[in-house]
Structure formats: C-alpha cells, structure tokens
Amino acid sequence: MCDMGFWAIVEKKTGKMIGRIGIEPKMWNGRNSVVELGYLIDSDYRRQGYALEACRAVLEEAEKRGARHLYCRIHSANLPSVNLARKLGFEKIDYHLEEEGNDINVYRYICNQ
C-alpha cells in the first residue's frame, strides 16, 4: 500500500482546472485494500493528451510512495479510457457486472516494470 492523494489537472497555458486525478484504497472481492487510480477530465478537454500526461505523473508518484500495483475499473464501452489504460501499461485481469448492470473491466498496472 502507499500514501494516497488527489490532484487537480490544470491546463498549463491558462491555469484553469480541467479535471482531477487520484489514487485511493478500495476493497475488491472481499480482498485486502488495493490502490485504485481514478481520473475525470472536463468534456471540452478530452482526447487532447491531458489524461495521459496526468496518469503518467501519478503512476510515477505512486511508485515513489511505495505502490506495487495500481488498479483501475473501466466501463467496457468507454473505449478512450480502455485505450489509455493499455497505453499506460495496464493489463485487463478481470471483468464483472455492477448491481446497476454496468459491465466493468478491471485493469492492473505493475509498478517498477
């Protein structure tokens, strides 16, 4: 486990907050807590590389803080996030349905690869 945190994603040229990103503990499948990566980018700023840059910075920070693995859960229909996870080096390890019926893919990133 590592120290957790949340950060603002800020557009460099304007200083405007355009999203957020963080790592936090989660309980999955009754297992011990794992570290989950989550992010949200304002719709006007998506598909411009902000999430990739922010995720790379947070992965590096998580490794510095002692994380061994990071996980993310992504709706299978959210192809931009699926592609981002793959580009970052996450691998799909599980699949489940939420109570609401949403299908979720679970991805894992192994730190210090």
Language model feature labels by segment:
Residues 4-113:
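Acyl-donor (CoA/ACP) binding surface of acyl/acetyltransferases
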